[in-house]
UniProtKB/Swiss-Prot annotation:
<protein>
    <recommendedName>
        <fullName>Chaperone modulatory protein CbpM</fullName>
    </recommendedName>
</protein>
<comment type="function">
    <text>Interacts with CbpA and inhibits both the DnaJ-like co-chaperone activity and the DNA binding activity of CbpA. Together with CbpA, modulates the activity of the DnaK chaperone system. Does not inhibit the co-chaperone activity of DnaJ.</text>
</comment>
<dbReference type="Pfam" id="PF13591">
    <property type="entry name" value="MerR_2"/>
</dbReference>
<comment type="similarity">
    <text>Belongs to the CbpM family.</text>
</comment>
<dbReference type="InterPro" id="IPR022835">
    <property type="entry name" value="CbpM"/>
</dbReference>
Length: 101
């Protein structure tokens, strides 16, 4: 099965995610998303960036956070997800050595 990556120009990305170009510039500056390609005059974004921005927009509407707050919240949420995954793997390793009654 082939991997397919969808890419968006700035205009397409803004239309797809519902944000303005100014907001896109701000969230790129904050590191919320990064362009997958930087061409001479424009950025190109992949489908993963669109998912992250849609998640950020949802946080903005539901929690009334500003973009810097959203950047922090997304970072913390990603850290939590990684820690949960690491915890799950460590528990699996530990269960091999601990006798269950």
């Amino acid at each position: 099965m082939a991997n397919v990556t969808v890419t968006f120009t700035i205009t397409e990305f803004c239309l797809h995610t519902g944000i303005s170009e100014e907001e896109l510039n701000e969230i790129v500056g904050l590191g919320v998303v990064e362009p997958s390609e930087i061409q001479e005059t424009t950025w190109v974004f992949d489908d993963h960036a669109a998912i992250v921005v849609q998640r950020a927009v949802r946080l903005r509407h539901e929690l009334a956070l500003d973009w810097p707050g959203i950047a922090v919240a997304l970072t913390l949420m990603d850290d939590i997800a990684h820690l949960k995954q690491e915890n799950r793997l460590l528990r699996q390793r530990l269960s091999r050595f601990v006798a269950h009654p």
